[in-house]
Amino acid sequence: MPTAVHAPYDSAELAHAADVMVTDQMWVKPGHNVLITADTATDPVGVEAVLRAITRAGAKGGVFTIPQLPFQGMLADPYVPESLGAAVVKSDAWIDLTFPYLAGSHIHDEALKGGRTRYLLALDIGAGGIVRLYGRGDLDKIYAVQSALDALLVKARGKTCRITTELGTDVTCVLDKPGYIKPRRANKPGLYSPPGGSVLFPVVESVKGTIVVEAAFHEYYAIFDKPCVLTVDGRIRKVSGGGPERKVMERALRRAGGGEFGYVIHFTHGMHPAARMTHTSFEEATRVAGNDAIGLGTPFWMPGGGENHPDGLMSMQSVWVDGVRIVRDGDIVGPPKLAKLAAALTPVYR
């Protein structure tokens, strides 16, 4: 994955992008209580931009900064201040810029059970990521593609899916019922994520083949010196390659899998026309066109599962569903209606 060159942005562009995040996607209205969670590694420029956007929306915003967590999800519970739990349940909208993140933790679950909070799992996107994901993409067009691909995957439940890459990935699975959907706007309580990615949920026991990842979020976001190879036959049976990061990957897999390597929980497909491989943001990397963030470990519907799994990352994937190619080397090529929508995606130049 080569390092990309990025255009600079000015304060006006950042302000516009933060407004899109806050008022367009997260549906923040005057009088709403909005919480930003950040950690000691979060980009402060991005945090301030989002806070200012909340103020411009006429809402009441605040920032709760914690030390960077060692793990995400329920594994973060011992490290999360109780006072933060009191704040999230009183929030109409919660924008989480921590990484590792709070989704799947006890306070996150309590907030969603309360039926009030709209939660954005924004992770580590920073100011530059906010500009690219929210300011340099037409969200209506992006969600048109995302929703069409999601609908295709819903209809394909029970069909065989095959995914390959030039680096050697060749894996098949049976598609399962989607675990969740990603609506255009956060106008109801629940979990939301930045635009530009669809999720493919396999029947976990059906996944078979070889997965070659170039990067991962295990305990942190790491680019591998050498590709890491996962051999899968129902469960993940073997991990090889990966250079010095392999030990961290194996440790994270066993932690999330209850001592075993666990399963492949999900595949994804990135489609955001302005997302870039910065090597500083895992979340933005998952939105790059053709990238696939592969969830590994134990799914949330099994004991001990949840948002505590590591993710592998691979690029330029090709995807077949029921023998029909829908993605070629990262580009959506079918069916014709979906391919036409995808071909219209271009960055917004300001």
Q: Model-flagged regions — what are they?
A:
Residues 38, 213-215, 232, 240-243, ...:
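Active-site proximal loops enriched in glycine and acidic residues that flank catalytic Cys/His/Asp
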Residues 225-240, 319:
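Active-site and channel-lining beta-strand-loop segments
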Residues 238-296, 300-303:
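Dual-mode signal for accessory low-complexity, basic/Gly-rich regions
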Residues 1-225, 233, 247, 258, ...:
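Active-site bordering "gate/hinge" segments
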Residues 1, 21, 26, 74, ...:
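Detector for methionine-enriched segments
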Residues 279-349:
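Internal helix-turn-beta structural module
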